[in-house]
Amino acid sequence: MTVVTITPGAMSFADWRAIYEGASAALTVGAWDAIDASAAAVARIVAKGDPVYGINTGFGKLASVRIASDDLATLQRNIVLSHAAGTGAPSPTPVVRLMMALKLASFGVGASGVRRETAAMLEAMLARGLIPVVPSQGSVGASGDLAPLAHMAAAMIGVGKIDVGGAIMPAAEALAQAELTPLELGPKEGLALLNGTQFSTANALAGLFRAETLFRSALITGALSTEAAKGSDAPFDPRIHALRGHIGQREVGGALRTLMAGSAIRASHAIDDPRVQDPYCLRCQPQVMGAVLDLLRQAGATLGVEANGVSDNPLIFADSDEALSGGNFHAEPVAFAADMIAIALCEIGSIAERRIAMLVDPALSGLPAFLTPRPGLNSGFMIPQVTAAALVSENKQRAYPASVDSIPTSANQEDHVSMAAHGARRLLDMADNASAVIGIELLAACQGIDFHAPLKSSDALEAAHRHLRSHVPTLDDDRHFHPDMEAATALIRSGSLVAAVPASLPGVG
């Protein structure tokens, strides 16, 4: 198993993606000294006896209740058990694994006050593939992702359930099989495990990873559709995009030029083409997809900062033995980033669906109706376009900003929340919808290109065409369409379409 070394504050987009895709994670050696110093500071604060939130007081609205020294361990266990109140379907294992690594990285900064044993338990569970079962619903994104992180923490103390290679078993049993002893929490540790934005951030990053793959796939299918409709590459001229100046627009224009370079199909209508301008879904790809790229990068920058920061409360400053209460648990930046990704996913699918609709309409594409050689007897791509329209409409509904919502909790002590978890959790479903739309476009565009034989497209797009045809044959007559759609969508989701094309395409990280 690949192991990513967690260097707190210096983790890259690629590092987090590797963990999401199955790598384990281990703290860099230097982080353990920071953890030890922070834990020692908590011990000195406890010995001093002054009331400090989360160490010797109650939580939330009960912060004014002082807790006796003999009850401090019980206090931390109680917060884990009482806050493990999530509901809904289990979160995807890759998301939970990433959440655990994000929490481990946060502890490694040395501002949470946890002991070495607590961080080591997270590290050991990651190394052994012990992934807590975490219900997906229950967080409002402040005070942190309390319920989801409580389910993670519960597994660490031997309560709840753990996924071990797809087998769900009681946490205590899974820990015993891995020769791990359930944690006994010390002062501040229960709160440190629960307080933070790691669940929302993990879900948002997962959505961003999928969005990047989708974005690159859609550049390829967009170029294929342009070829199928005998569209012009003139709108991708770099002089146009230089005058406007947006970086994403310039990069997308360049990518489309690269993808279409050397096309015999394009050369066949480069002179005396009666069409002066293409529909927006072809002509404005650099403007639309460039804006998508810029938005994804902005979201990525925000999540990169969040993933490398500390969203605990209170924060422990070991050099002065201070515990400062603040609001780093408020996930507003993550909520905004998730909303950006949702909008981007929506637009990737939206413009692709318009290209599909254009291709099946002979008045717009010049191709046979619904891309079938014998329309009437055959319906061809009639209903796949309807499916794409349905999926795009569903994503439009889901793209409503989560961050504009708020609801008071904890007896109005926590009176403004981010809804980051809600905003981030929807992203994988939206990515699934958009993947299916791009898969349908891949089928439709390659079908359209087949009508131009023996003319060939560019080397890059011919590689994409061959890759699809190695899985799905040309549609000569109507057949069961669902398997074709599933196969094409799998090429999009896996990233294999992008890998098959010999071109460097812009991305987030």
From Swiss-Prot:
GO cellular component annotations, sorted alphabetically?
A: cytoplasm
Subcellular location(s) of the protein: Cytoplasm
Q: Which UniProt keywords apply?
A: Cytoplasm, Histidine metabolism, Lyase
* Sequence position, cross-link 5-imidazolinone (Ala-Gly): 142-144
Q: Which domain of life is it from?
A: Bacteria
Q: Which Pfam families match?
A: Lyase_aromatic
Q: Name one GO molecular function term.
A: histidine ammonia-lyase activity
Location (main, coarse): cytoplasm
Enumerate the catalysed reactions: L-histidine = trans-urocanate + NH4(+)
Enzyme class, spelled out: lyase
Modifications made to the protein after synthesis: Contains an active site 4-methylidene-imidazol-5-one (MIO), which is formed autocatalytically by cyclization and dehydration of residues Ala-Ser-Gly.
Q: Which residues carry this modification: 2,3-didehydroalanine (Ser)?
A: 143
Enzyme Commission identifier(s): 4.3.1.3
| InterPro entries, A to Z | Aromatic_Lyase (IPR001106), Fumarase/histidase_N (IPR024083), HutH (IPR005921), L-Aspartase-like (IPR008948), Phe/His_NH3-lyase_AS (IPR022313)
Family, per entry: Belongs to the PAL/histidase family.
**UniProt name for this protein:** Histidine ammonia-lyase
Q: Which organism is it from?
A: Sphingopyxis alaskensis (strain DSM 13593 / LMG 18877 / RB2256)
What gene does the UniProt entry assign to this protein?
hutH
